[in-house]
Amino acid sequence: DIPFARPFIKYTPTWPRSFMPSNQAERNRVAKMKLIPVHELIEGKKLLFVDDSIVRGTQLRETVDFLYENGAKEVHIRSACPPVMFSCKYLNFSRATSEMELLARKIIFELEGEEGFKYIDEYADSSTERGQKMRDAICKEFQFSSVEYQSLDGLIKSIGIDKCKICTYCWNGKE
C-alpha cells in the first residue's frame, strides 16, 4: 500500500494557473507563491507526485525544488496525459509563443536537433529507446527520481469516449 496525502497546501484563490502568464519570470513567481509545505509529509520521504499535464514544466520545477528544499528523499513524477508535443491551435490553451517552449519538444531538440521531430511518436512512447532518453533527460534537468506519462491509448481508454470524438492534436499533431 502506498499512502495518499498532500505534502503541501496549494493556495490558488488569488493566483492563475502557472502556465498562463506569457512572461517566464511571472510564471515562476506564481508557481512558487502557491505552495505551503506540510513538513511531516515531506521530510525524509519518497514522494510520488501526479499532475494533470506537463506543458513547460514551470510548476513541476518549482514543486520539485520546493519538495527537496523541505527534505524530500526522492520525488517521482507521473503525468495523467501524454507528453504535450504541439501547441493547441484551436483553443490556444497552452499559451506557448513557440512550440520550443513545450518541455517535450525542447528536450527532443536538445537530444537530436530538428531531426528529432521526425520521431515524435517514438519519443511519446516510453517503451522505445527515444522515449526513455527523453524521460531520462527530463529527470536530469528537473532532478526527478523518475517521470512517466500516460499513453494516448491509455488516456482515451480512461475517458471512455470514442477516439474520433476527442481532440488529440497537442499530443500527436493529428487533426
Task: Give, region by region, the residue ranges found by the protein language model.
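PRPP-associated nucleotide enzymes
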Residues: 1-175
